[in-house]
């Protein structure tokens, strides 16, 4: 069962979908906060995982990031890593108030960029007892260096120039402006390589297109993103357990392997054979083993 809920995150109202089990079991249940990828909304990958987790007996909350989807915040389309981390903590606070949630058994799941946001959230919020990432991405690193670490350094310098100009425009009472996240055509998307194309295919075709999913970010997102280091304090998660799930064909897989190498025990790296980064958003042959693994993981610690 899925119900609409809202909660506070640093003064903004965040829109969420709470997925609950259909069975009639009584007593307090473990709960999972589920964060969506950058540009995503709760109706896409995060909602899918939340519903699947509910099918295994967990209460799961998928929500729209501040400034995006149905959540509050202006300018629309702002991607603010610090606030994204705060959103996760706000979701934990909300779950802690529910009568059917055991506040001592709350975990977090982050997909793509949220895989990079749940790490600092968990590192600094001891209410989160276990954390899982799927296709984790450090959004700051990705903007600085590209998904494959091969980006021309001049690209981010140019974007930072635009971000600086946007802040000046904002101070003058003008609009901050925005930049497109995805190309307009399939041909343009294919020219970006595997990672660029599969992101376009997921967000911009009937595969998973959603009217509230962001197709652009504000220019004043850039300097916030570039200053963010998702895995800098991953060692602080211990002694709480960490599971990182990634596809063997994901262009971003090096971010997961490097991050978990710097984490302390207990930790586990779990590979999904033949899966790409975005395959793990919605393709059942890859999502099912990922869900089965995280259910086993969360049950062991809840």
Question: For each predicted feature, which ranges?
Answer:
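The serine-hydrolase catalytic nucleophile loop
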Residues: 38-51, 65
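Short beta-strand/loop motif that positions the catalytic acidic residue
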Residues: 244-246
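Catalytic active-site module of serine/aspartate enzymes centered on a nucleophile-bearing elbow/loop
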Residues: 275, 282-302
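Short beta-strand element of the alpha/beta-hydrolase
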Residues: 27-37
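N-terminal cap/lid segment of alpha/beta-hydrolase-fold proteins
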Residues: 1-27
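Alpha/beta-hydrolase-fold enzymes
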Residues: 119-200
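Conserved alpha/beta-hydrolase
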Residues: 52-72
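Alpha/beta-hydrolase active-site loop
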Residues: 45, 78-99
């Amino acid at each position: 069962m899925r119900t609409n809920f809202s909660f506070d995150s640093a003064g903004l109202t965040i829109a969420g979908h709470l997925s609950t089990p259909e069975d009639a079991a009584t007593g307090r249940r473990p709960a999972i906060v589920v964060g969506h990828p950058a540009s995503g909304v709760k109706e896409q990958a995060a909602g899918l995982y939340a519903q699947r987790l509910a099918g295994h007996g967990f209460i799961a909350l998928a929500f729209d990031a501040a400034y995006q989807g149905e959540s509050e915040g202006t300018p629309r389309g702002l991607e603010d890593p610090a606030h994204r981390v705060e959103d996760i903590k706000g979701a934990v606070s909300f779950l802690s108030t529910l009568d059917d949630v055991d506040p001592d058994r709350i975990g977090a799941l982050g997909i793509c960029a949220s895989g990079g946001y749940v790490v600092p959230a968990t590192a600094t919020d001891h209410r989160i007892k276990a954390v899982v990432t799927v296709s984790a991405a450090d959004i700051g690193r990705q903007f600085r260096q590209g998904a494959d670490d091969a980006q021309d350094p001049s690209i981010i310098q140019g974007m930072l120039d635009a971000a600086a100009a946007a802040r000046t425009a904002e101070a003058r009472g003008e609009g901050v402006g925005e930049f497109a996240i995805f190309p307009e055509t399939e041909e343009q998307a294919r020219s970006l390589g595997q990672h660029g194309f599969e992101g376009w295919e997921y967000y911009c075709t009937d595969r998973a297109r959603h009217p509230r999913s962001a197709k652009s970010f504000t220019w004043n997102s850039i300097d916030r993103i570039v200053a963010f280091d998702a895995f800098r304090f991953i060692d602080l998660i211990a002694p709480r357990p960490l599971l990182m799930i990634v596809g063997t064909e994901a262009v971003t897989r090096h971010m997961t392997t490097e991050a978990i190498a710097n984490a302390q025990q207990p930790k586990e790296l779990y590979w999904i054979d033949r899966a790409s980064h975005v395959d793990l958003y919605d393709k059942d042959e890859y999502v099912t083993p990922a869900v089965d693994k995280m259910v086993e993981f969360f049950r062991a610690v809840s």
